[in-house]
UniProtKB/Swiss-Prot annotation:
<dbReference type="InterPro" id="IPR011705">
    <property type="entry name" value="BACK"/>
</dbReference>
<dbReference type="GO" id="GO:0030057">
    <property type="term" value="C:desmosome"/>
</dbReference>
<dbReference type="GO" id="GO:0043161">
    <property type="term" value="P:proteasome-mediated ubiquitin-dependent protein catabolic process"/>
</dbReference>
<protein>
    <recommendedName>
        <fullName>Kelch-like protein 24</fullName>
    </recommendedName>
</protein>
<comment type="function">
    <text>Necessary to maintain the balance between intermediate filament stability and degradation, a process that is essential for skin integrity. As part of the BCR(KLHL24) E3 ubiquitin ligase complex, mediates ubiquitination of KRT14 and controls its levels during keratinocytes differentiation. Specifically reduces kainate receptor-mediated currents in hippocampal neurons, most probably by modulating channel properties. Has a crucial role in cardiac development and function.</text>
</comment>
<dbReference type="InterPro" id="IPR006652">
    <property type="entry name" value="Kelch_1"/>
</dbReference>
<dbReference type="InterPro" id="IPR047071">
    <property type="entry name" value="KLHL24_BACK"/>
</dbReference>
<feature type="repeat" description="Kelch 2">
    <location>
        <begin position="365"/>
        <end position="407"/>
    </location>
</feature>
<dbReference type="InterPro" id="IPR030596">
    <property type="entry name" value="BTB_POZ_KLHL24"/>
</dbReference>
<feature type="repeat" description="Kelch 5">
    <location>
        <begin position="504"/>
        <end position="544"/>
    </location>
</feature>
<keyword id="KW-0677">Repeat</keyword>
<dbReference type="GO" id="GO:0005912">
    <property type="term" value="C:adherens junction"/>
</dbReference>
<feature type="repeat" description="Kelch 6">
    <location>
        <begin position="546"/>
        <end position="592"/>
    </location>
</feature>
<dbReference type="Pfam" id="PF01344">
    <property type="entry name" value="Kelch_1"/>
</dbReference>
<feature type="domain" description="BTB">
    <location>
        <begin position="66"/>
        <end position="133"/>
    </location>
</feature>
<feature type="repeat" description="Kelch 3">
    <location>
        <begin position="408"/>
        <end position="454"/>
    </location>
</feature>
<keyword id="KW-0965">Cell junction</keyword>
Amino acid sequence: MVLILGRRLNREDLGVRDSPATKRKVFEMDPKSLTGHEYFDFSSGSSHAENILQIFNEFRDSRLFTDVIICVEGKEFPCHRAVLSACSSYFRAMFCNDHRESREMLVEINGILAEAMECFLQYVYTGKVKITTENVQYLFETSSLFQISVLRDACAKFLEEQLDPCNCLGIQRFADTHSLKTLFTKCKTFALQTFEDVSQHEEFLELDKDELIDYICSDELVIGKEEMVFEAVMRWVYRAVDLRRPLLHELLTHVRLPLLHPNYFVQTVEVDQLIQNSPECYQLLHEARRYHILGNEMMSPRTRPRRSTGYSEVIVVVGGCERVGGFNLPYTECYDPVTGEWKSLAKLPEFTKSEYAVCALRNDILVSGGRINSRDVWIYNSQLNIWIRVASLNKGRWRHKMAVLLGKVYVVGGYDGQNRLSSVECYDSFSNRWTEVAPLKEAVSSPAVTSCIGKLFVIGGGPDDNTCSDKVQSYDPETNSWLLRAAIPIAKRCITAVSLNNLIYVAGGLTKAVYCYDPVEDYWMHVQNTFSRQENCGMSVCNGKIYILGGRRENGEATDTILCYDPATSIITGVAAMPRPVSYHGCVTIHRYNEKCFKL
């Protein structure tokens, strides 16, 4: 091994000879005699690069070794092509290819500010730059132009830290323009969570229509009450009333007018001159009035509460049993499909009964009848979380169904232990009375019953022990009469129906099929299949989707599955499991206040 030394030795020293190549003195050494490493990796660290950059920056200030002048807005910046090219792929492409700029001493760049170029060069030559609220926008745009991603990201991060109700909408628009998805999302989330404050600032009034709708239609909008949304929309419209008046109806379709307090609705909304002079808004006002009278019977996207108000739509499962001949369950439990949480409510009274009927009236729940020949009717007060006995049925029954139509409860058909019943009773909650109305054309038990387009529909059922019906019987409360409509494609009993968006959906009956009926056009269609056959399942509409809960399988055992069908996509998915298998239970949707409501 040869070890090169950096000093001269006396020729007389033992073992020294002249190097023929360099005339320097070297030692002849045996590698075996070395006890340490054969080499030493030395690094001065990042300070070396910093020192070089510092010197280059001094060269730039002194115009020493500069080989290009960048001209921006008439101001000249002497620079080094090598430094610019090393830092920016934009300049590397400009100077390293056969472009005209690679040969010219003076290169003019348009579209940026001279001040921005000064900040940019400060970063290029020092690795440091001061980002402020005054320069962040043009510094971001300059770093984007010159493809300096590190500086660009630093500017975006700085903007995130500056979010405030007075500027978040402007920053969001900036992020959208420059495809900054992370910053855009954070701005939108911030604006949703501080909407009450955001809507008071000038930026809010300068939103375009689509941007405004994007906020007011969101379920994630954080507000104390829906009145805040209405007032924000009206402020926006009145800001440029002549231009924005034609947009009022479209905007109000995204305000949940039915959820406004009735007093506020009457004293503020209905008397607003702009609304009064907009006939196209009358239908929205009518919908709100109907909801104030009918409650949850009247469902639309505008009747779904925003979660930030503390209220949410929940599915309430009432009673049921685990298997045929099994123990009747006393439980009343609510399920929130958004959070997946189950909560216990007051237990069902006199739970020894089975095969009763359940429906929701406004925001309360009714349970009627039950095996054997019970006339009892109970109502669950959702505000007090208690069950209250109300007026009894005129005729005891079980295997019947209930539905609400125009604010009144209808008990339909059923079985009295000997015969299928055609009798129909109507309950007025204000007078607490049951009255007989026109009977069914065909007596059935275990049909599917729901209301839609102002009429009551009784679908299928069992006219006797051995047969199933495919008839669809429609009741008109104005004429107190029944008509037969288009038959369901398959005759079934123990089926369940719900209505959504003026369509009726039917499932159960030990079939996988989910059918949809259009009562206006009077025709049926098969829309989807469930994953297994079941009957006597629960079915309810919640958050604009249809949920199928539990039911009894072909072997007689109950199931704990929950399926969710989305009519918008026609996709059915398995969601979760119920606390226990159950069938012959009631399922309804109500609004419930959450103890753990959303807070910032």
